[in-house]
Regions:
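Typically the conserved alpha-helix immediately C-terminal to a functionally engaged Cys/Sec
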Residues: 40-56
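Non-catalytic, surface beta->alpha helical segment in thiol-disulfide oxidoreductase systems
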Residues: 92-134
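Bacterial N-terminal signal peptides
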Residues: 7-16
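Short active-site neighborhood of thiol/selenol oxidoreductases, capturing the structured segment around
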Residues: 25-38
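Positively charged n-region of N-terminal signal peptides that target proteins for export
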Residues: 1-4
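Thiol-based oxidoreductase modules, predominantly thioredoxin-like and allied folds used
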Residues: 56-79
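Short, internal strand/loop/helix patches
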Residues: 71-95, 99-101
Length: 159
């Protein structure tokens, strides 16, 4: 009986590992640069949460929070785990927007900020996700002149 339980436990462990290994990876990372003291960050958090729920599983939020040293460090680890450290380095310390990054190529596709409402933000993230997958996205909706252009780099290598 002990042998059977051991075999069953090993089979369960192997199944758990393989399920994680084959879990669907996102098409894009939505890197939310935020700080508790920044009003735009607070607005963006709510809108981005709703937008990501509308978009579904093709986008994964990565939070880079500079409110405390512990949150900053957690964000650095999350960026490292997803191999997007250059994105982290470029804008850490500049809160109030989210960069959309192709999960495969790690290329920055565009950015959204608190000027977008949740529906507009979801639509823009869907467009950027389609672009990351090499697909066309057709929409007649207008975002009223709002741009998905990212802010200039906040941290520039002096060398």
């Amino acid at each position: 009986m002990k042998k059977f339980v051991s075999i069953l436990a090993m089979a369960g462990f192997a199944a758990a590992i393989s399920a994680d290994a084959f879990a669907a990876s996102p098409d894009v990372y939505v890197v939310n640069f935020r700080n508790d003291k920044n009003t735009e960050s607070q607005v963006l958090d709510t809108q981005l949460s709703t937008a990501l729920a509308l978009v579904g599983g093709n986008a994964e939020e990565v939070v880079i929070d500079t409110s405390t040293a512990a949150k900053w460090e957690k964000g650095a680890h999350e960026a490292f785990d997803r191999n997007i450290v250059p994105v982290f380095n470029q804008w850490v310390g500049l809160p109030g927007f989210a960069a959309v990054v192709d999960a495969d190529s790690k290329r920055i596709i565009g950015c959204v900020n608190s000027q977008f409402n949740a529906n507009e933000m979801a639509r823009e993230i869907e467009k950027m996700t389609a672009r990351a997958k090499g697909q066309a996205f057709t929409s007649r909706a207008s975002t009223g002149g709002k741009t998905t252009k990212c802010p200039p780099a906040y941290n520039v290598d002096p060398g």
